Amino acid sequence: MSVPANGNSSRAYLHDFLARAGLEVRPGERVLDAGAGRAQYRRLFAHAQYETADFLAVKGKTYAQPTYVCDLTAIPVEDGRFDHVVCTQVLEHLPEPGRALAEFHRVLKPGGRLWLTAPLFYAEHEQPYDFFRYTQFGLRRLLEDAGLTVVELAWMEGYLGTLSYQARVMSRALPPDAASWGGGVKGRAAGLGARVARRLGRHAADWLADLDRRHKFVRKGLPKNYQVIARR
C-alpha cells in the first residue's frame, strides 16, 4: 500500500525502498540495520533475524538499544554473517565512508545485498557528525572501491520532492522581522514579504510533496537522495 507524503515525500519513498527490501529478505535470513537509530523499520523485517548497530553518540537523539554499539568501520561480528545490510541516511555521518562500505562487504555473505540511501541535497544535521553529500558517481566509485557491485542506483524521490524540501527550508529560514532586513520602511516591507513567503512556503512544501508521490519527475533537476542496491 502506498504511503502518503504527509509533507515529506522522501520519508514515504524511503519506506517504499525498505518495504521492498523486506519483501526480498527470506524468512530466517539475517539482516543488519547499520546506523539504525530508533530502529523504526524493524517491523518490515519481522520475519528475519534483525540486528542493529549504532554508536549512540549524537546528543539529544533517541536510540533503540542496538545489538552492537560500535563504529560502522569495525562491526564486532565474524565475516559473512549477514544476508542483507540496510544503511539508510547514515553514510553522510561517517568520516570514513569507504572504510564503512568495505566493512559491509566483509560482514555480508557472498551474494548478500546492501540497501543504501544517501543524500545529495540536504542541510547540515546531527552536528558535528555530518561530513559529506554524494553524487551518483561518488556513490558508485565508493561502492566499487569497496568490492561491491552496483545492481541499482536511482533517485529516491523526484525533483518535486527536492523543491518541496527547499520550500520547507524557506518557510523556516527567512527572518520575519524588520531588523534582519535593515530596519526602516524597506526593512518592514521585506519582513512582511518574508512572513508571506514563509506561509506560502509551508503550503507549497505540502503540495509539492503530495505531487511528488503522484508524479515522480527524474529526467531533470536533482534529487534530495539516491537509493542503491549493491551486491557482494
Q: What is each stretch, according to the model?
A:
Residues A12-D16, D33-G35, T67, A209-D212:
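Short gly/ser/thr-rich secondary-structure transition/capping motifs
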Residues M1-V25:
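Class I SAM-dependent methyltransferase Rossmann-like catalytic core
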Residues G98-R99, E103, K109, R113-R231:
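S-adenosyl-L-methionine-dependent methyltransferase catalytic module, highlighting the catalytic core
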Residues A5-S9, E92, V218:
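Short, surface-exposed alpha-helical recognition segments that flank or form part
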Residues A19-H125, T135-R140, V228-A230:
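Conserved SAM-binding loop
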Residues S2, N6, T88, Q127:
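Conserved short-loop catalytic and cofactor-binding motifs
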